[in-house]
UniProtKB/Swiss-Prot annotation:
A motif (Effector region) lies at residues 34-42. Belongs to the small GTPase superfamily. Ras family. The gene is RAS-2. NCBIfam families: small_GTP (TIGR00231). PROSITE patterns: RAS (PS51421). GTP binds at residues 12-19, 59-63, 118-121. A lipid is attached at C190 (S-geranylgeranyl cysteine). The modification Cysteine methyl ester is found at C190. It comes from Physarum polycephalum (Slime mold). This is Ras-like protein 2. It is found in: Cell membrane. GO terms for cellular component: plasma membrane.
Length: 193
């Protein structure tokens, strides 16, 4: 049986810990220095729900000056981890723009996503409540998890949860629908005879 591969993309503002989460998952260690990412790709074989699969994770630039690159990697991603820092209100406020761009580029009403509030080990510096994260995820219709790359808290749950969301979409596509926007509502398509 062929091994399944999942193309995951991690998005969010600069400095929220996207690379730290990814490296913690892939290499089991925490990077504490901030070195802005332009784009890095990581691969790891894992077993999720008794199924061996390969995670192909694209760690993206959060800085606005790299926003032109986003459309390209959003086209190729099957699912997205949207990360904000619980210590940064502005990073939380940016999340909706990332989601809207993903939906626009994918030309779908729904795309597999997980919302992650990172740096939950810094509770004394919290600017975004857990409830606010839960409410936003509920509005998006996606899972929510608070993570800490430093403490390795909910790191696997975040990425594995996204794989489960992708699997749900694949099952939904087989049943019909697939979340694709309907462009020809009420118009009969041409038939070749």
């Amino acid at each position: 049986m062929a091994q399944l591969e999942y193309k995951l993309v991690i998005v969010g503002g600069g400095g929220v810990g996207k690379s730290a989460l990814t490296i913690q998952l892939i290499q089991n260690h925490f990077i504490d220095e901030y070195d802005p990412t332009i784009e890095d790709s990581y691969r790891k074989q894992v077993v999720i729900d008794e199924e061996t699969c390969l995670l192909d994770i694209l760690d993206t630039a959060g800085q606005e000056e790299y926003s032109a690159m986003r459309d390209q990697y959003m086209r190729t991603g099957q699912g997205f981890v949207m990360v904000y820092s619980i210590t940064s209100r502005s990073s939380f406020d940016e999340i909706n723009a990332f989601r809207e761009q993903i939906l626009r580029v994918k030309d779908k009403d729904t795309v597999p996503m997980v919302l992650a509030g990172n740096k939950c080990d810094l509770a004394s510096e919290r600017q975004v409540t857990t409830n606010e994260g839960q409410e936003l995820a509920r509005a998006f219709g996606c899972p929510f998890v608070e993570t800490s790359a430093k403490a390795r808290l909910n790191v696997e749950e975040c990425f594995y949860g996204l794989v489960r969301e992708i699997r749900k979409e694949v099952i939904g596509d087989k049943k019909g629908g697939g979340g694709k926007k309907k462009k020809l509502m009420g118009i009969d398509r041409c038939k070749l005879l």
